């Protein structure tokens, strides 16, 4: 029953996401070769290889006869069929798909901070908030690689209602997508990029993708990703899993988790767990879980676009779960508070690793989804 409820909620997310899609970038189904890492999939129905990041591997997808099954079912149930990267820079504000033949030397400044973003279930890089987040980070003079794993995330193919039934497949695909993302990151490092200048942002299922990518990078001997933002990491089919099979606080030097809805993992999962407005219901969303779920991305965007800051005070998970808990708004005399603003996006910030870990109740203005600017309190 809980799974069915979760599926219905996810369908609402789908309806919301399709309503807000941006048409700025053309969605390409065939990803490209990257730095010599090649993965080939063969689809017998079209007799063409599909190139995907990774090492050489062959996969055969059987034909289902005159009526193509993927006309009715989402592509995600067939496994990882394709993925690609979109590069955003100051000179490429609209983003462009990257292939092996692209001369990244013209577009990529390896001295700048590089962000990798990963969308969630039934979404893509064209989604309005995903695109807006990438553009906002570029305005801070960061380089952004936006991972498009829409085929494996059940975005393409199939009927809307049937796509929801593909959620378990999308969950299963997060590990392989994460591994392929790691291959891409390691290729960049092999060609001169520094892991110390990199950070990840994942929303919902994309948070777990970033977690799996970080795990592989570390296990491959490249070190730990400095900073990983998990925007309301997906809960369905992850809530009972242990660290090896989901996002974990050890995946990066600092994992910052933004909790905003009931569809996200409610229990602490990062090195710094931030419960915005209590972590379950957001201002003006009321009981709309989909609104609260995507609000985690909007808060990140607001920090960059509007220079918002969000003050928080220490809390326990028991206090967070208690609907009768009261949290006093901090002031200049408050101690042990935490203020989150756009400075937190810099993975090279010296004080980043000194941030007090733990759980914080984060205050959100009900009208502006922001809080006081230049807010200070005692540390």
Curated annotation (Swiss-Prot):
One of its GO terms (molecular function) is serine hydrolase activity. It is found in: Secreted. Its main location: secreted. It catalyses: a 1,2-diacyl-sn-glycero-3-phosphocholine + H2O = a 2-acyl-sn-glycero-3-phosphocholine + a fatty acid + H(+). Residues 1-20 form the signal peptide. One of its GO terms (cellular component) is extracellular space. Expressed by the venom gland. Gene3D superfamilies: alpha/beta hydrolase (3.40.50.1820). Glycans are attached at residue 126. One of its GO terms (biological process) is killing of cells of another organism. Disulfide bonds join 76-154, 243-248, 285-291. Pfam families: Lipase (PF00151). The active site is at 204 (nucleophile), 232 (charge relay system), 293 (charge relay system). Keywords: Allergen, Cytolysis, Disulfide bond, Glycoprotein, Hemolysis, Hydrolase, Lipid degradation, Lipid metabolism, Secreted, Signal. Residues 21-73 form a propeptide. Contains five disulfide bonds. Its EC number is 3.1.1.32. InterPro entries: AB_hydrolase_fold, Lipase, TAG_lipase. Catalyzes the hydrolysis of phosphatidylcholine with phospholipase A1 activity. May act as an allergen and induce hemolytic activity. Belongs to the AB hydrolase superfamily. Lipase family. This is Phospholipase A1. The lineage of its organism: Eukaryota, Metazoa, Ecdysozoa, Arthropoda, Hexapoda.
